[in-house]
Amino acid sequence: MYDANVSSYIGKLDELDAQYKSAVESFSKKTILFGDRFPFRYLVDDYGLNYYAAFVGCSAESEASFETISFLSKKTDELGLKSILTIEKSDKKIAKTIISNTRNKNQKTLEMDSLQSTTSKDAANGTTYLSVMQNNLNVLKEALQ
């Protein structure tokens, strides 16, 4: 039973991995921008994506400098990005400030879930690693358009 469950789960992980690879390959854009902390370094490295972020990793900082906001706003314009990414439970303040300093001021904020805030109640209600990463894939697809 254990071996069958492990094999089944590994198969689901492999399928999800293939979906990420296929999605990234299908878009000409390969850059995302996070107006927030950035806990997705391994994900972007694994799938060959470029990124810009207000903070490196899961920094404890909560206020981005003027220079950082200015740089990210210019990158958004330069790359023609239609969205700014945040993490779950973010106040989106930095992302909104970046957007307000872009040329068109019409980008969306999209949210990816790092799983760092997942509770036992979430798990009891059906939240799984696979379900969260599938939702993140859908967000990533929108961000790469």
Where is each model-derived feature located?
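Extracytoplasmic metal-acquisition and chelation regions
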Residues: M1-Q145
